[in-house]
Amino acid sequence: MITVHFVHGARSYLPELAAYQAHIERLGHAVQMHTQAHTVPDDAQAVWWICGRVPAAQARRLQGAVQVHEYTSASVAPLAWLKDRIKQWQHPVPDFRVFQSEWVRQRMGFEGDAVPYALRDMGVPESFLTAQALQPPEFDLVYLGEMRRLLHFVPLLQTLGQAGLKLLLVGDVPPDLKAHLAALGHIQSTGRLPHDQVPAQLLRARAGLNLMPDVLPLSEQTSTKLLEYLALGLPVVSNPYAWAKRTAQAHAGRVQLLGLQASAAHWQAAMQALPLRQTDRQHLASLGWSHQLQALPVWDALFGAGR
């Protein structure tokens, strides 16, 4: 049995870590999580860095281990390009790399070397694919995810109220956003919830709301919440940006794109045109974490071809 030591930032929300742990344990191996590299034992056999910065001294200390570098996203502004180049130049060379997408791989600039790699998109827990609503929806829309991001969309939130639409926020609302929401009686929030309670909260609404600033790298990266809405059978309303447009094409009729300047009347019409919630989602099995992880070649690198 091999223990895989994951090193990640304590402040990051990384649902993939739970999926990795479950998959690795199903393969008969073990997992330990670390927020500081120095807590990884010297005799570790496998170290999986969620990048972030990989300290060269720690990588040398652990040179007896198979080392994986995972890039879940490219760097964000300010100085995003420079941050990515610093990672490219300063990171030690690993045994394997994992990228969320081909776009992230190219953005990080590693395409010229010989290190083997895999692309691993975001997934959803299998429980999302089977959860069912137990009562009619109480809200028109539900939003899950990074709440601070909603500060970019306060005018849109006001438009939802003008359209007579009720919005549920699933998660912890920061104080600066609360100040904006105080005058908006059409919005309620749940506060922070354990992830296993999220499906029931999302199913309280008719549709999922996906809002993302149309700036790199956010506009090219997977919106996990949009995948979770789809996995629960909810139709989705999203602002248009590159990744959302591709996803709307891949899930024809399930994702409606609506511009940020859309009027209250446009929102009312969009909501009336939404399809019904899907109760049978077997065709969406590929969104599940088990499907995303099972074929990754990184397992052979860590555990050998026999696993």
Q: Model-found features: residue ranges?
A:
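Conserved catalytic-core segment of nucleotide-activated headgroup transferases in glycan assembly
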Residues: 9-17, 124-182, 189-200
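Donor nucleotide-sugar binding/catalytic pocket of nucleotide-sugar-dependent glycosyltransferases
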Residues: 95-130
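A charged, aromatic-enriched C-terminal amphipathic alpha-helix characteristic of glycosyltransferases
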Residues: 15, 127, 258-307
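N-terminal pre-catalytic "stem/leader" segment of glycosyltransferase-like enzymes
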Residues: 1-53, 237, 304-307
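Active-site proximal beta-strand in glycosyltransferases
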Residues: 47-48, 60-77
